[in-house]
Amino acid sequence: MELPLGSDLARLVRVWRALIDHRLKPLELTQTHWVTLHNIHELPPGQSQIQLAKAIGIEQPSLVRTLDQLEDKGLITRHICVHDRRAKRIMLTDMADPIIQAVNDVIDQTRSEILNGITPEEVSELATIISRLESNILSLYEMQS
């Protein structure tokens, strides 16, 4: 009998995300907010919404709601691009720095607790397997297009 690997991976992602959401609740943020803030922080300043959506791996319309929420919280600003008035550039505000640090602390602590009892070698092997699975899936997409 084959293992339900896809279901197992989906369930793992779901419970991991739920735990992150629970732990970020005191900061009034979610895992989606964290992923967005993290990518804005790591990318060169002034990325467009389109560039950010690609970096995160989501469609731009899906990103807009999260950006609206982060803007309402005063963590980002959006500015019309001078070279393309249709594009908006995203910038972190000064308020974002301490929030990003607090979120990273929560994420690091949670990751450490989740990986408790798992050796670095096992984590590395898992990362390699996940990368190979992703590569296989992307190859299948390319073959069908």
Swiss-Prot record:
Q: Does the keyword Metal-binding apply?
A: no
> What's the superkingdom here?
Bacteria
Cross-referenced SUPFAM superfamilies, in alphabetical order? Winged helix' DNA-binding domain
List the disulfide bonds in this chain: none
Would the keyword Signal be found if you checked this record's keyword annotation?
Answer: no
Q: What happens when the gene is disrupted?
A: Loss of prodigiosin and carbapenem production.
GO MF annotation terms: DNA binding; DNA-binding transcription factor activity
PANTHER family in the cross-refs = TRANSCRIPTIONAL REGULATOR SLYA, TRANSCRIPTIONAL REGULATOR, MARR FAMILY
Reported function? Transcription regulator that can specifically activate or repress expression of target genes. Participates in transcriptional activation of pig (prodigiosin pigment) and car (carbapenem antibiotic) gene clusters.
Query: Which family does the record claim for this protein?
Result: Belongs to the SlyA family.
Q: Partners and quaternary state?
A: Homodimer.
Q: What is this protein called?
A: Transcriptional regulator SlyA
Task: Look up and give the organism this protein is from.
Answer: Serratia sp. (strain ATCC 39006)
Gene symbol here is slyA
